[in-house]
Amino acid sequence: MAEPSAGRQKVVIVGAGPVGSLAALYAAARGDDVEMYELRGDLRDPNTIPLNFTKSINLALSERGITAMRQANREELIDRVLADAIPMHGRMIHGRSDGKLWEAAQTYDVHGRAINAVDRGTLNNALLDELSRTPNVKMFFNHKLTGADFRTNRAWLERRTPGTASTPESVTEIEITFDYLIGADGAHSASRYHMMKFARVDYQQEYIDALWCEFRIPPSPETGDFQISPNHLHIWPGKEFMFIALPSADKSFTCTLFAPAWHYEKLEKSSPQDLVTSFDYNFPGVCPNLITPEALAEQFTENPHLPLISLKCKPHHFGSSVVIVGDAAHAVLPFYGQGLNAGLEDIPVLFSFMDQYGVYDDSISPTPEARASARAAALQAYTNQRTADTWAINDLSKQNYLEMRWGVKSPVYKLRKMVEETLDHYVPSLGWQTQYSRVSFSNQRYSEVIASVKRQGKLLGVAGLSSVLVSVMIGAGVLMRWPERLSLGAVWRTVFGRN
């Protein structure tokens, strides 16, 4: 990391979630004066309502996110976050056959690495507490970005009084200036909206044909412990539906039902008993075993049924004055557990380009004009690299939805996973890894993950074809040597060892 520069910059960050907070730590460590503005109240207050109006407390934290936080050089931060994390070593697939419930574990990684289920409140609190102890950071809550001029580096915000209706009397408009602004304000980003007035942004937004609703599996009423294994991501797969459960620190599980909109409409018109029947048919063992019928109906009725959005855009910046990160630049579907991790990873990538181009080196950027020029080059380089990677994880997340719904039960999926893990474990010099391991347990660029997996797929295809050809050649040789003694059935049994 570069040493703090003598020429301090003023950095404004919009959004005080994990990505914006981490960006504030990185900028502050380089000597910048940081102001962070958040639409909501202080996220450390349990009464602050999340923007999606749910109280979901689970996040999946893997290698990329952990690395990004470690590189902030705040050891207490990562220790605090991981202290209460629950490691998930694999998936637990649930089903029913011949009237009997079954579950089957699938490890994530042949080397035993795990994804961490972390508490959203713990993560937010840890980051914001670090910022509170940082003298060159100021935090402003209940501030809404309403306008920005990225040519003159000015922005306008409404300061709102908590707990009051938005009226001219309760809202005060303020104007701020900055050297550059980081927009980390989510999928419906105001920063991106205002940046698009200045930059020619290619923008693609997509809602998939699925809604999600949150449920909760409580701790065991008898023991107070987890009702099912806490060290797995639990999946009840179906071709069109999926129910998943992630462990929480209070021994409960936060669950999500993913289903097409038409299925939600059907259930909304159904009776509570029909809801229970639907769950019993599609997700055997959930109700009444883990969630009571009354709780299931109550949670389905009271919790919102929300859409799933993904977006891509390019560029992620304009000039030297603004850059968008996290969901503001690349909201992804939740099916790879990489939304948080990709957003956190944006920050070290961004600041590595800032360092590389001398933004914080006074010998390279001795004046504000020189720093602005270096910053523009750094932001352009960031866009050039990060766009390819964020588009890649966007595509991978969509593909993983299909895998989680029914691919996890596919013999082809299981065979390829077994072959790749065997090569990874016994012949590590080949550098062979499953796609999941590359995404979740490495810092390899997402775009390079796709390229590597394609190469592995081609090699497996060639190897499989070669095996078939060798078998055919052996069979042909046997027929030519003893044509009168062997039938085709005998050859089949000889070559393939089958009856």
UniProtKB/Swiss-Prot annotation:
Its EC number is 1.14.13.9. It is an enzyme of class 1 (oxidoreductase). GO terms for cellular component: mitochondrial outer membrane. It comes from the Eukaryota. GO terms for biological process: 'de novo' NAD biosynthetic process from L-tryptophan; anthranilate metabolic process; kynurenine metabolic process; L-tryptophan catabolic process; quinolinate biosynthetic process. It is found in: Mitochondrion outer membrane. It holds the Pfam family FAD_binding_3. InterPro entries: FAD-bd, FAD/NAD-bd_sf, Kynurenine_monooxygenase. Keywords: FAD, Flavoprotein, Membrane, Mitochondrion, Mitochondrion outer membrane, Monooxygenase, NADP, Oxidoreductase, Pyridine nucleotide biosynthesis. Belongs to the aromatic-ring hydroxylase family. KMO subfamily. This is Kynurenine 3-monooxygenase 3. It comes from Aspergillus niger (strain ATCC MYA-4892 / CBS 513.88 / FGSC A1513). The lineage of its organism: Eukaryota, Fungi, Dikarya, Ascomycota, Pezizomycotina.
